[in-house]
Regions:
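C-terminal transmembrane helices and immediately adjacent loops/tails
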Residues: 1-216
Length: 216
């Protein structure tokens, strides 16, 4: 779903200081070292946030034998029942496990996509803040963002909707389930961090404190 926003970056207008930059060395690769560092740095932010949401949503449940719930051969555990040595009701806990894990998967998918959409804003410039560029100044990105977000909402919030003339639910296409407003609040709060952290980096880089010979 990040395809349309990525394409929309191609119509980003040139920025005011582009002619003030020295030319790239002829032997400099694409991506260069700075590009590679940014890829790993922002990638680490998004991976960390995605894993955090997965475990906050209950994806890290364990079984009585201490193995992850993601191992399909295991059942989630009721700690009190395990401590007492009481055998759990398999069918009940299987149903709980499936529902809990699909919920975690849906939140993980959603936050990963939102990370990508918000990161498109970062990619408009490696040096300039999106606020100085104008958050909504690239109309193509705005439209692409809304279209991609609408598709995400379609597959998540209409997960229980049965496709006409079939018995197949939309959620079955991507193994999603409907999320609550609170879930979306967590997703947005975590995903927007990729913009906050990158804006802080740009502020530090552009700060006069770190300027060399008066250049920024």
């Amino acid at each position: 779903m990040d395809g349309p926003p990525a394409v929309a970056l191609g119509v980003e207008k040139k920025h005011g200081n582009v002619m003030n930059r020295p030319p790239r060395p002829v032997d400099e690769g694409l991506p260069n070292r700075n590009d590679i560092w940014l890829i790993f740095y922002l990638g680490a932010v998004m991976v960390t946030g995605t894993l955090l949401v997965f475990f906050l949503a209950g994806g890290g449940l364990e079984t009585c034998d201490g193995l992850p719930l993601s191992d399909g051969t295991n059942l989630p555990f009721d700690q009190a029942a395990c401590d007492a040595g009481v055998e759990t009701e398999i069918s009940k806990w299987e149903s709980y496990a499936d529902d809990k894990f699909i919920h975690a998967q849906t939140m993980t998918l959603s936050v990963f996509i939102m990370f990508q959409l918000f990161n498109v804003m970062n990619c408009r410039s490696q040096e300039e803040s999106i606020f100085s560029l104008g958050v909504f100044s690239n109309k193509a990105i705005n439209i692409a963002f809304l279209v991609s977000f609408a598709l995400l909402l379609f597959f998540v919030q209409l997960a229980d909707f049965t496709i006409p003339f079939t018995s197949f639910e939309i959620g079955g296409l991507l193994s999603t389930k409907v999320l609550s407003l609170n879930d979306w609040g967590i997703i947005m709060a975590v995903a927007i961090l990729v913009v906050v952290i990158e804006e802080f980096r740009k502020f530090i880089v552009n700060s006069r404190i770190f300027a060399i010979d008066g250049r920024r």
